[in-house]
A protein has these predicted regions:
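Active-site histidine-anchored catalytic micro-motif
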Residues: 1-137
Length: 137
């Protein structure tokens, strides 16, 4: 079985950001030489996530508003009693999840017509990483 592991690095300019990473993942899959298998894409931080959805700006805004509605920034999270101020970021990341697995078929990502891979940042303006691990034959 072939494997290839690479890391994508991020340092967003804003506290929350949604970054389309399909092209970077496609390039890593191509570089791996894997024709049939899968790729794991996983945020290596507890205040970030990875998800698959449409790359449409209105939908991205809807996702952001939905997450803010479910886990708004506020000062009274128990987590803040530790001196932190990012309780909402942890909850948003739980809702998005931290990883996706995408099939690789004929050497390419086997995504649906509108499916794209995104990195979701909820506590930005600092260095973060995403691991991309391709496995297969």
């Amino acid at each position: 079985m072939k494997t290839l592991t690479e890391y994508l690095k991020f340092h967003t300019k804003t506290h929350r950001a949604y970054v389309h990473i399909t092209p970077q993942v496609e390039e890593i899959v191509r570089k791996s030489g894997v024709k049939e298998g899968m790729v794991l894409v996983s945020a290596m931080h507890i205040t970030a996530g990875v998800y698959v959805n449409d790359n449409e700006s209105g939908l991205i805004e809807d996702i952001d508003q939905w997450l803010e509605h479910l886990a708004p920034f506020r000062k009274n999270y128990k987590h803040h009693e530790t001196g932190e101020d990012n309780g909402d970021s942890h909850l948003k990341a739980l809702l998005i999840h931290h990883e996706v697995i995408v099939p690789v078929t004929a050497g390419k990502l086997d995504l649906g017509t509108w499916q794209r891979i995104f990195y979701a940042e909820f506590d930005g303006q600092r260095d973060k990483r995403v691991i991309v691990k391709v496995m297969g034959e």
